[in-house]
Regions:
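Short, Gly/Pro- and small/polar-rich lid/capping loops
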Residues: 1-10
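Acidic-aromatic substrate-binding/catalytic surfaces of carbohydrate-active enzymes
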Residues: 9-127
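Secretory/endomembrane lumenal or extracellular ectodomains immediately following the signal peptide
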Residues: 129-132
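Conserved small/polar residues in nucleotide/adenosyl-binding loops
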Residues: 134-136
Length: 136
């Protein structure tokens, strides 16, 4: 599997033999959005990633452009791993409740590292040696 990070689009591009999987970092708050999964796309240095599929240039705009539409943005943006309690009314992947009973979680991208080969797991069986791996 090939893994690339395209800095200009802030996009992760993962390719298998027949499929492509793309996710992008969006806005100043570093939301992680699902861009594409499907038939393999051809990547070239001159072709930008299809981040237009996220439709962040349309209403509801990203919070840095129009914070009044934050809830609408959170409810419609295709989060890669959606949280709960902050405006996204779809099914969440993670739910958090504090000791005081408050709910809400908003995960944000901080950094990543792409390693050349999947590390061995001591004491555990391991499959597919030699594959690239991404830590986000």
């Amino acid at each position: 599997m090939a893994i690339k990070y395209i800095e200009q689009d802030r996009t992760f591009w993962l390719d298998t033999e027949h499929t492509s999987y793309l996710l992008a970092i969006v806005d100043q708050e570093n939301f992680v959005g699902h861009v594409y999964y499907g038939q393999k796309l051809q990547y070239t240095e001159n072709t930008p990633a299809p981040v237009y599929l996220l439709r962040t240039g349309e209403a509801p705009f990203v919070p840095s452009q129009n914070n009044r539409e934050r809830v609408s943005f959170l409810d419609s943006f295709p989060m890669e791993y959606p949280g709960n309690g902050l405006g996204d009314y779809r099914e969440s992947a993670i739910s958090v409740r504090t000791a005081q009973g408050h709910v809400g979680v908003q995960l944000q991208y901080v950094s990543h590292e792409i390693v050349k080969e999947k590390p061995a797991l001591p004491g555990l069986p391991s499959t597919f040696p030699g594959l690239s791996l991404i830590h986000i």
